[in-house]
């Protein structure tokens, strides 16, 4: 699995074994502007201020 790992979308990395999800975190007030991206094993929960989106395909975040 390859996930974007920087704020600029064309940079990505191969996820280590066991991390089979990509995630993107953004502020609820500006959901189109990511604040953090990367690989994870479980999807973090969204909060009142931060929206988290997880996916399972290459560069989907």
Curated annotation (Swiss-Prot):
It comes from the Eukaryota. Expressed by the venom gland. Keywords: Cardiotoxin, Cytolysis, Disulfide bond, Hemolysis, Hypotensive agent, Secreted, Toxin. CDD domains: TFP_snake_toxin. InterPro entries: Cytotoxin_Cobra, Snake_3FTx, Snake_toxin-like_sf, Snake_toxin_con_site, Toxin_cobra-type. It is found in: Secreted. PROSITE patterns: SNAKE_TOXIN. Belongs to the three-finger toxin family. Short-chain subfamily. Type IB cytotoxin sub-subfamily. This is Cytotoxin 3. It comes from Hemachatus haemachatus.
